[in-house]
């Protein structure tokens, strides 16, 4: 008998939870802004939005070698494939990430190849990629993020600007904001939008998560654009998680390729010219590679995993009282800070990002020229903490041992025959750093079930509770 795929996007809410939701909904009106509505903690994912964004960088093997594809059309499809690869990574049921507070940050990194993966696609990679995000605005909420892999000359800058709306039996998160993927060796930029997120079945039926509406992937230099529809299921017909799209030449409107499939499993691409159909992506054939972060005890009080630690612990334990109390304490402190700034006539300024246009931000850091990839990473780490103390010591030791006195840059001296300037370092990173996962209940490990679906489970490797209690007491007794 064939194995029936589990419906991981649907969720049955217990009667008590349903009553809480109905009590909230009774005070709402259609199309009402939900930004100031306090949701019950049982619908929360134990992870901040700043960390949640890293899901979209969890298939680096689909991005980092893109510049080796010579044909512009095939390279464009490679970028589309990478873009479509991140949506299947999500918690079970209908969960929303924690809303970051103003000034909250999250940083992390990926070291290639991952020592805990046998995926041949990942084993071919080498080097280090870094990520940094900051909540740069609270009204409206704006999360700015940055990704860089110096070895492969790939950079991503983006903002997420969610706008929540009540739609009757559904709640919608309108995901405004644009991501820019830069392939620096080719001087190409890909501008990308996001699908909207819908929570169905708020009043009746099963609660279910759906992605919907149109997104675009556009490359001005190659004159190519993908228009992709994330289809929502109709009341009578249709299927869940389907997509349909096309790739066209912008200047002429000529359709070159058609895209179809399901964003949580298999997708294919058809050439309009030849009629040939080939796989675009099968997510079951690629390991998910989650971000690593510094140990919790090395994080600042406004870094996501440390800030929300008690709330995440309580959410996972289904302790709604503690989750609500700790979450409210953090949000109350944020409101008090806002009042104090108003009294003192102080305008908030992001710490690590700068505004380049209304509601658009990039990292306020200039990548140094003429430096090795490792020196670039060290410079970034000095600007915004990314690596652990153990890794940082290893960085500087490697640099001192591989830098000639007459040349402070190791760019010309440390590359091997493959052109790799960080491989030598990455292979000798301290063993704990190789396998380190974010040491917080907000982190997850990945498990692939027999039916091919990807589930996220809480990482059992937690920091010492006594250390954490001390950290939080020092941060704020109320938290």
Swiss-Prot record:
Residues 439-452 have a biased composition (Polar residues). GO terms for biological process: endocytosis; exocytosis; intermembrane lipid transfer; maintenance of cell polarity; piecemeal microautophagy of the nucleus; sterol transport. GO terms for molecular function: oxysterol binding; sterol binding; sterol transfer activity. The modification Phosphoserine is found at residues 328, 408-409, 421. It comes from the Eukaryota. Transmembrane segments: none annotated. The keyword Nucleus applies. PROSITE patterns: OSBP. It is found in: Cytoplasm; Nucleus. Residues 404-479 are annotated as: Disordered. Residues 404-418, 470-479 have a biased composition (Basic and acidic residues). Keywords: Cytoplasm, Lipid transport, Lipid-binding, Nucleus, Phosphoprotein, Transport. SUPFAM superfamilies: Oxysterol-binding protein-like. Pfam families: Oxysterol_BP. InterPro entries: OSBP_sf, Oxysterol-bd, Oxysterol-bd_CS. One of its GO terms (cellular component) is nucleus. Belongs to the OSBP family. This is Oxysterol-binding protein homolog C23B6.01c. It comes from Schizosaccharomyces pombe (strain 972 / ATCC 24843). The lineage of its organism: Eukaryota, Fungi, Dikarya, Ascomycota, Taphrinomycotina.
